[in-house]
Every structure is written in structure tokens, then in C-alpha cells.
Amino acid sequence: MTKEKWFKLVNKEYSQIDQEWQWTYLLLIPFIFNEQVIHKITITDHWKEKHKDIITNEKILELVRKLNKEVMKPEPKKKPAWPDVFVPRGIEYQNKRFLLVFWFERSSSDWLWIRDCYPN
């Protein structure tokens, strides 16, 4: 039995503004987070600064899959202008727990921006 493909890489670019690599994926199956249908996910390379030996984009995508149909509250804002940031803790993958840091990109309700991932 083959695993259903959830994501398709549609863009890989280096952002001069953010000084980081960014990979954008389209969702190939219905994916819902906070009662919103998600169509795109962008992963930044911020995780490579400290966790390149244990984190990969593929692992992040597997963790994101586990958020399908989840509803969660954002973290308290540190600055009013910042987006609502979500930090689910303890997402299990291969008998280990991980933490993701992400938000809805550009106030979009269908695009998640994954900023970081690390062991929890």
C-alpha cells in the first residue's frame, strides 16, 4: 500500500528580504486547520540554524499532516502588529516529539507559513 501524496512542491526560492530559503507546497488533498481549508504551505529554512541534523522539510510536512482537522488557539502576541502564531507542542513522529512554529501567511486563511521546527 502506497502512502497518499499530500503535498506538491511548487516553488523554491531564496528571499533576499528575509535572507532565507523558502519552499512552497500545494495541498493535494483537503486539509483543514482551525476550520479553514488550507491550500498552500511555505516552509522557511530557519530550522537549519540549529537543527539541520535532525529536521528536514519532509519531516515538517509529516508533522503538518498531523494537524489536519485540528483547532487551536494562537500564542499570546508579543507585538500587536505580529500575526497570530501557533506553536503546537508534542507532535509525535517516529517515537519522538516535535514543536512547530507557524502562522497564517499575509492574513490569508488558506496559507500556512512554517517558521521553525525542533525537538520538544
Please identify what each model-predicted range represents.
Residues 1-120:
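Ribonuclease/tRNase effector modules and their secretory precursors
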